[in-house]
Design a protein with these regions (language model features):
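Bacterial N-terminal signal peptides that target proteins for export
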Residues: 2-11
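C-terminal motif of bacterial Sec signal peptides marking the signal peptidase cleavage site
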Residues: 23-24
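Short, ordered beta-strand-loop transition motifs
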Residues: 28, 82-88, 158-165
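Short, well-ordered beta-strand elements
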Residues: 30-41, 89-92, 117-120, 166-167
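N-terminal lobe/hinge region of extracytoplasmic solute-binding protein
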Residues: 35-85, 122, 129
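Aromatic- and charge-enriched surface segment that lines or borders ligand/interaction sites
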Residues: 79-133
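Surface-exposed binding/hinge segments that line
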Residues: 115-118, 123-175
């Protein structure tokens, strides 16, 4: 049972990296076309729940890692990641030079930093966000207390150790993905 909880946490962590992170924008066409059976009602990746919402978010946002065709993990917005010997700390090193554009009305490109990921995870655990994905990260340090409103979001076990270095702290040992 403990192994399944560990496996579930790792799978959720990887899925959320994809769903929660910001997109790296490049030059080129400003149009995007895809087929869905209904119009997405929500483009917020932290609360997207319908199939059309999720498909849209998967096509709009990039993650720290991605799955390759053979099912293994490869860096996407990170250069690499490390897992501590006790498997309680996951450290991701972001690629340098990643940017995002906030909105059509503000064409400024902003640098993507570890603080952006920290903000996303902290927001996911705010009681008012009602993110269905928060439960998938229950192994993060202080996650239950933050979700219950007993501790501030800043107490969550996600930190920006450096501008391009993101650290996740876990309460349980996690089996490293293979």
């Amino acid at each position: 049972m403990h192994f399944l909880k560990q496996l579930r946490f790792v799978a959720a962590l990887l899925a959320a990296f994809f769903v929660l992170s910001l997109t790296a924008c490049g030059s080129g066409s400003n149009s995007f076309t895809w087929f869905v059976d209904s119009i997405p009602a929500n483009l917020d990746p932290q609360v997207a729940s319908s199939a059309s919402d999720i498909i849209a978010c998967e096509n709009l946002y990039s993650g720290l890692v991605r799955r390759t065709p053979d099912g293994s993990l490869a860096p996407e917005l990170c250069e690499r990641w490390e897992v501590s010997a006790d498997r309680l700390t996951y450290t991701f090193y972001l690629k340098d030079g990643l940017t995002y554009t906030a909105s059509k009305g503000d064409p400024t490109d902003y640098a993507i930093t570890a603080e952006d990921f920290v903000f996303a995870f902290q927001r996911m655990f705010l009681p008012g966000t009602n993110s269905p994905y928060a439960v998938e990260f229950s192994a993060l340090e202080n996650s239950a207390a933050v979700l219950a409103g007993q501790k501030p979001a800043s107490a969550l076990g996600v930190t920006a150790a450096e501008p391009l270095k993101l650290v996740f702290l876990s309460l349980i040992h996690i089996s490293e993905p293979t």
